[in-house]
Amino acid sequence: MHLEVLDTYSVAIEPGTVEAHIGHTPLLRLRFLDNELSAGVQIFAKAEHLNPGGSVKDRAALSMILEGERSGRLKPGMTIIDATSGNTGIAYAMIGASRGYPVKVCLPKNASLPRKRILSSYGVEIVETDPMLLTDGAQLVAREIFASDPEKYFYPDQYNNDANWLAHYETTAPEIWEQTDGRITHFVTGLGTSGTFVGVVRRLRELNPKLEAFAVQPESPMHGLEGLKHMATAAVPGIYDQSLVTSTLEVATEDALLMTSKLAREEGLLVGPSSGANVFAAWKLAASLREPAVVVTVLCDGGERYLGETFR
């Protein structure tokens, strides 16, 4: 089934730039889990780690930057400032370099070292924040920096910016619909800013009101899954819409890391721990289904950002 993929970005993007290659990622069949599923149940993963900046956050970062330019809030000479667990910051850095904007990010001190090195390689100014407060603490610091000089900074505020989820409403969801020929029955992904979940589910529910949507989160507040929120104990993003959730699937850090390793060694996919959490949750859900189903999840980022931590 063909569905036109909305491309609101095209008018603002020069062909041949790095931004022009964000999105249109492949949808991969995860066959190594087939023998544990009922006949007709399939698991697919959207390979967002293959975006130019290496993560699903490329889409939202581009959308927020373009919206900033369109609205006049982002002007030449301004610096982009935001809180991040790492991936959105890397996406800001890549796109900022391409479009001529300096970038400053606030991220927890315990963010993975490879992510920090990538940010530094782009010339990003890093402000490390209290690791015990996770990204909630980073948001507080980012707001303080922005408030100190609002004429200098563009603050996308990814946790509360509708351009975040609209990126997935306009691009990711139509891609999934077309790549599954409209057969998707279940969508499973983790919650960080919640932009991917909210945008994809809102659009796909317009196309298939019976779509079941599962939100993945760590099973405890103290976890090792960078980028994912334990919603019961974290600051809930302003863009999050609980009404879209069919059910919540909780994943232990250990299970996510084991699945991350299996993805590399049995499927040839070197991805990060949040991807492992998504696939583990999708597998547990799929294994419970007795009727034919198409379960789609997301590979959020590449495993290169976790070498020496997840992979030893």
Task: Annotate each predicted stretch with a short phrase.
Residues 1-312:
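PLP-dependent amino-acid enzyme catalytic core
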